[in-house]
């Protein structure tokens, strides 16, 4: 389902643990890590799509999390042509996303990467809030930056420092009411001061 400009409606999920670290999922059979995300189906609200994707990709139910905040407007990114199927070129332009910030109220053991027969991740870990900005594939980096920046003030931890943000980055954003979503490539070792847990494999 595309809007008139060729963007597919989508939701992104930033899931926090009690230490305000973020869930970071390793895409199945790749070396890429990213936040959970997925398309909004016809007739779904962004919140309904978020809870569906949360269960499909992470195995969590609504009673395992609490919604802290969401982005005010759609955040858009365009996908380069070489990432788009040939039959979709000229029609599909990219993704427009509403991002949700969630607090995990359950336990790590509640997560299940094989909740469906089409898993997205085969491992996961907890990561410092800002570190993912440095390991996101370039064409999605602006949206990650904007979502993390907009939602950072709601994170229940003092003294956030956006030391990884780059100047000059911009993402397309529109009011939610206007007319009118994958591949991430980690680039190497993370900052020595960053909080990173050991990857947990899917069982």
Swiss-Prot record:
Motif (Nudix box): 38-59
Top EC class for this record: hydrolase
Compositionally biased spans, kind Basic and acidic residues: 173-185
Region called Disordered, residue ranges: 170-203
PROSITE patterns associated with the record: NUDIX, NUDIX_BOX
Domain of life per record: Bacteria
EC number: 3.6.1.-
A biological process from GO: mRNA catabolic process
Entry similarity comment: Belongs to the Nudix hydrolase family. RppH subfamily.
Biological function: Accelerates the degradation of transcripts by removing pyrophosphate from the 5'-end of triphosphorylated RNA, leading to a more labile monophosphorylated state that can stimulate subsequent ribonuclease cleavage.
Protein name: RNA pyrophosphohydrolase
Organism: Leptothrix cholodnii (strain ATCC 51168 / LMG 8142 / SP-6)
Species classification: Bacteria, Pseudomonadati, Pseudomonadota, Betaproteobacteria, Burkholderiales
């Amino acid at each position: 389902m595309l809007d008139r400009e060729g963007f597919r409606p989508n939701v992104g999920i930033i899931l926090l643990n009690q230490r305000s670290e973020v869930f970071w999922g390793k895409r199945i059979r790749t070396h890429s890590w990213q936040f959970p995300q997925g398309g909004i189906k016809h007739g779904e609200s962004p919140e309904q799509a978020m809870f569906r994707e949360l269960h499909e990709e992470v195995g969590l139910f609504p009673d395992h999390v609490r919604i802290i905040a969401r982005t005010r407007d759609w955040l858009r990114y365009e996908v380069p042509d070489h990432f788009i199927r040939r039959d979709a070129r000229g029609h599909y332009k990219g993704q427009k996303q509403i991002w949700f910030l969630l607090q995990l109220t359950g336990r790590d053991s509640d997560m299940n990467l094989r909740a469906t027969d089409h898993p997205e991740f085969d491992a996961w870990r907890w990561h410092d809030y800002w570190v993912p900005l440095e390991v996101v594939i370039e064409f999605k980096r602006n949206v990650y930056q904007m979502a993390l920046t907009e939602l950072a003030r709601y994170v229940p931890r003092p003294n956030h420092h956006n030391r990884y943000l780059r100047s000059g980055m911009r993402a397309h954003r529109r009011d939610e009411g206007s007319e009118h979503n994958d591949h991430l490539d980690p680039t190497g070792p993370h900052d020595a001061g960053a909080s990173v847990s050991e990857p947990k494999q899917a069982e």
